[in-house]
């Protein structure tokens, strides 16, 4: 199985040329290559806590290393594994009692340790192979994982930043935010040092009701982060689906429960292909996805290089009792 993993990663690397400090724009070729690997047939949908999920995490870790990122402080590896609680759902999925999920975490040191840390994240798992049907999860959430990878590449290539930036891709989100919850309680840095967490979820297609190129941010009114990033040029707007409770349904919530200012950015969150076998690379809008990721580069760079610390507004502050 290790040979299989290394072969997959080596094939994926073949699509890339060396990164120079001048190459700091989001690259559609990189976006497509990441998507094609993560949501390709070989990984069978990256089912939560499966070997395919572990291969996806190893791929992300290898990319982090190639960008010049380091393992997080105190870690000797880019990978973190977490136990998966036994539930009726894990039994139905046939997961073993000792199943574990895998997070991939990379760290870009800043020049001012006192300035805090910016956390950029996504979940890398999906539904996987369900009774012989493969749910590839190209939009949910190979697209968010790809966004993290491209931002990591661009931000690392553009030189040093004042703040350290941590990039995390979590496992087992589909089983109930398991990877991110474990990360939140076993973080490599004090959570009080995390200035903000921006999570990416389903950025592979535009919502037809938004202005061209716009994205939504969950919990927009819960902190000053969204309005400030929008003022800096981020094409984000408030979540138009409050009844769906998207703020509580993605990995940002695990960090928000720990007191971190944390939000998720999405494209078409109610897309009809969600959790269907039609969520494939063929249905990804690569032009939109590339523009969407690029639209966050300048605002995130500003956040990484400045002194602004977003504050919670007290609007719907989460409690430790999960929905």
Predicted regions and their residues:
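Alpha-helical metal-binding/catalytic segments enriched in His/Glu/Asp
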Residues: 104-106, 120-176, 296
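N-terminal capping segment at the start of a domain
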Residues: 25-55, 67-73, 79, 125-126, ...
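Second-shell loop/turn segments in exported
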Residues: 22-24, 41-51, 91-95, 132-141, ...
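Bacterial N-terminal signal peptides
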Residues: 6-18
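Metal-dependent peptidase/peptidase-like ectodomains
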Residues: 113, 160, 170-264, 268-270
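Extracytoplasmic/secreted proteins, especially bacterial periplasmic and envelope-associated proteins
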Residues: 26, 30-33, 37, 51-66, ...
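His/Asp/Glu-rich mid-to-C-terminal helical/loop segments that flank catalytic regions of hydrolases
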Residues: 272-323
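A non-catalytic alpha/beta surface segment that caps or lines the substrate-entry region
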Residues: 46-107
């Amino acid at each position: 199985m290790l040979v299989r993993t290394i072969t997959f990663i080596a094939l994926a690397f073949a699509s890339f040329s060396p990164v120079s400090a001048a190459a700091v724009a989001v690259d559609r070729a990189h976006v497509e290559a990441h998507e094609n690997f993560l949501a390709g047939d070989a990984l069978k949908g990256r089912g939560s806590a499966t070997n395919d999920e572990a291969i996806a995490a190893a791929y992300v870790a290898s990319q982090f290393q190639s960008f010049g990122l380091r393992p997080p402080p105190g870690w000797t590896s880019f990978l973190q594994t977490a136990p998966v609680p036994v539930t009726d759902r894990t039994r139905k999925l046939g997961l073993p009692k000792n199943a574990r999920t895998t997070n991939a975490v990379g760290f870009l040191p800043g020049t001012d340790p006192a300035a805090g840390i910016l956390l950029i994240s996504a979940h890398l798992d999906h539904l996987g192979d369900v009774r012989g049907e493969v749910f590839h999860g190209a939009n949910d959430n190979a697209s968010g994982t790809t966004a993290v990878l491209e931002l990591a590449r661009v931000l690392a290539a553009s030189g040093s930043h004042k703040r350290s930036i941590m990039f995390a891709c979590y496992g087992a989100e589909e089983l109930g935010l398991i990877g991110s919850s474990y990360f939140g309680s076993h973080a490599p840095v004090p959570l009080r040092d995390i200035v903000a967490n921006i999570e990416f979820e389903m950025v592979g297609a535009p919502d037809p009701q938004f202005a061209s190129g716009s994205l939504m941010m969950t919990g927009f009114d819960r902190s000053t982060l969204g309005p400030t990033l929008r003022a800096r040029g981020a094409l984000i707007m408030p979540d138009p689906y409050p009844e769906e409770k998207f703020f509580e349904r993605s990995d940002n919530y695990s960090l928000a429960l720990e007191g971190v200012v944390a939000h998720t950015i999405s494209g078409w969150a109610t897309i009809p292909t969600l959790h269907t076998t039609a969520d494939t690379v063929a249905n990804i809008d690569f032009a939109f996805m590339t523009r969407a990721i690029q639209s966050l580069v300048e605002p995130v760079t500003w956040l990484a290089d400045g002194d602004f610390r977003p504050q919670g507004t007290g609007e719907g502050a989460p409690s430790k009792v999960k929905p």
